[in-house]
Amino acid sequence: VLSPADKTNVKAAWGKVGGHAGEYGAEALERMFLSFPTTKTYFPHFDLSHGSAQVKGHGKKVADALTLAVGHVDDMPQALSALSDLHAHKLRVDPVNFKLLSHCLLVTLAAHLPAEFTPAVHASLDKFLASVSTVLTSKYR
């Protein structure tokens, strides 16, 4: 459960991401594909090379979903319901992959926002991404 301080930290950190959200989303995906090659199996139709338009496009989708979650932090299940349905019923993404992408997102944010990425912000973002992952996998049951 996100505390009021966590919510404040997440909103402030995501605010610093600003117009770079899509870029950071794509970078996190690239990190995931390189660090955890089995995740590539969900994207057989993508050009997974560095800077590809498809990875950039999906990175923007990831970032847009996170922006939506930040904006609806008190009601993520409702806000992310359609996305949860998509990943559970159509795409059938293994839930562990959300944890892998979350880790890569944290690394990407730490690399780009070193001054803002304090231990407290790190912990808040980790809890937030875990909450998003829980929501996205809630319809698997």
UniProtKB/Swiss-Prot annotation:
Boundaries of every Globin domain copy: 1-141
Binding site for O2: H58
GO BP: hydrogen peroxide catabolic process
PTM sites of type N6-acetyllysine: K16
Tissue specificity of this protein: Red blood cells.
Residue positions binding heme b: H87
Residue positions, PTM Phosphoserine: S3, S35, S49, S102, S124, S131, S138
Cellular component GO terms held in the UniProt record: blood microparticle; haptoglobin-hemoglobin complex; hemoglobin complex
Protein origin, superkingdom: Eukaryota
Record-listed Phosphothreonine modification sites: T8, T108, T134, T137
Keyword Iron: yes
Residues with PTM N6-succinyllysine: K7, K11, K16, K40
GO molecular function, one term: oxygen binding
Keyword tags: Acetylation, Heme, Iron, Metal-binding, Oxygen transport, Phosphoprotein, Transport
Modified residues (Phosphotyrosine): Y24
Family affiliation: Belongs to the globin family.
Function: Involved in oxygen transport from the lung to the various peripheral tissues.
Assembly mode: Heterotetramer of two alpha chains and two beta chains.
Miscellaneous field: The sequence shown is that of alpha-A.
Protein name per UniProt: Hemoglobin subunit alpha-A/Q/R/T
Organism field: Macaca fascicularis (Crab-eating macaque)
Organism classification: Eukaryota, Metazoa, Chordata, Craniata, Vertebrata
